Swiss-Prot record:
Name the UniProt record assigns to this protein: Malate dehydrogenase
NCBIfam families for this protein: MDH_euk_gproteo (TIGR01772)
Source organism per UniProt: Vibrio campbellii (strain ATCC BAA-1116)
Highest taxon of source: Bacteria
EC category name: oxidoreductase
GO molecular function, one term: L-malate dehydrogenase (NAD+) activity
Description of how the protein assembles with itself and partners: Homodimer.
């Protein structure tokens, strides 16, 4: 099993690489790529950790050696958010980066499962899909927007509020991966009750959690460590499913058969070919129905920007 981390010298990439070096199954290969010359050094540093995972790092303009033979590609390349920026401000730089990486993937490892972390995810995933479609290698079961950070934040905040073990809390999060498009389904959390005020406050906190971190870091970056953890959780779930484990379910932003938008985050069952089944997100509360209706114009607008950019 080969996993490639693209953008591996950045804050998310280094955190993700550290976690994967520790947690990938024995015998796995971990490849790190970044344009930054430090990348082989990041791999050398991580190679001293005593786990049965081999690691190599590649720098420069060409990600080909990292992508060759990859089963899973996790893309965190791009610029990070600064105070005052929203995820859409990242588009101008990151859209081009994702487009060129997707063009490489189409040639070098067209059958790999690709998880996109680079923001704005609502838009970068459609860009990658359009590139892969043009190349004739698109498989919608194998392209994911990684929205797991919204899930782990939801689990953490609910556990804090209700004095639960976060490991026992499950919160499906649907929609997209920015602002109002993030919709945690708090009505489906088992074993807890929320007041209307709690639902509203929690939903807003989850939607704005990225900004909370950007502001707390005071210009020094965005959510890198928690995002690394979220991407690791998603990447490991993919690896387990590809290796034949049954019943692996995570939320992800995929091209499915959603009636709401051509790309939509919801629970997906993972299997040996990527998405085995897009699962129903179940019954919504009135608050959630209203929030879903209210986000769709934004979400569909984000998707269209990506499709147009890739033309």
């Amino acid at each position: 099993m080969k996993v490639a981390v693209i953008g591996a010298a950045g804050g998310i990439g280094q955190a993700l690489a550290l976690l994967l070096k520790n947690r990938l199954p024995a015998g796995s290969d971990l490849a790190l790529y970044d344009i930054a010359p430090v990348t082989p050094g990041v791999a050398a540093d991580l190679s001293h950790i005593p786990t049965p995972v081999s690691i190599k790092g590649y720098a420069g303009e060409d990600p080909t050696p990292a992508l060759e033979g990859a089963d899973v590609v996790l893309i965190s390349a791009g610029v990070a958010r600064k105070p005052g920026m929203d995820r859409a401000d990242l588009f101008n730089v990151n859209a081009g980066i994702v487009k060129s990486l997707a063009e490489k993937i189409a040639v070098v490892c067209p059958t790999a499962c690709v998880g996109i972390i680079t923001n704005p995810v609502n838009t970068t995933v459609p860009i990658a899909a359009e590139v892969l479609k043009k190349a004739g290698v698109y498989d919608k079961r194998k392209l994911f927007g990684v929205t797991t950070l919204d899930v782990i934040r939801s689990e953490t905040f609910v556990a804090e509020l209700k004095d639960k073990d976060p490991g026992d809390v499950r919160v499906p999060v649907i929609g997209g991966h920015s602002g109002v498009t993030i919709l945690p389904l708090l009505s489906q959390v088992e074993g807890v009750e929320f007041t209307a005020e709690e639902v509203e406050a929690l939903t807003k906190r989850i939607q704005n959690a990225g900004t909370e971190v950007v502001e707390a870091k005071a210009g020094g970056g965005s959510a890198t460590l928690s995002m690394g953890q979220a991407a690791c959780r998603f990447g490991l779930a993919l690896v387990r499913a590809l290796q034949g484990e049954e019943g692996v379910v995570e939320c992800a932003y995929v091209e499915g058969d959603s009636e709401h938008a051509s790309y939509f985050a919801q629970p997906v069952k993972l299997g040996k070919d990527g998405v085995e089944e897009v699962l129903s997100y179940g019954a919504l509360s009135d608050y959630e129905k209203s929030a879903l209706d209210g986000m769709l114009e934004t979400l569909n607008g984000d998707i269209n920007i990506g499709v147009e950019f890739a033309k």
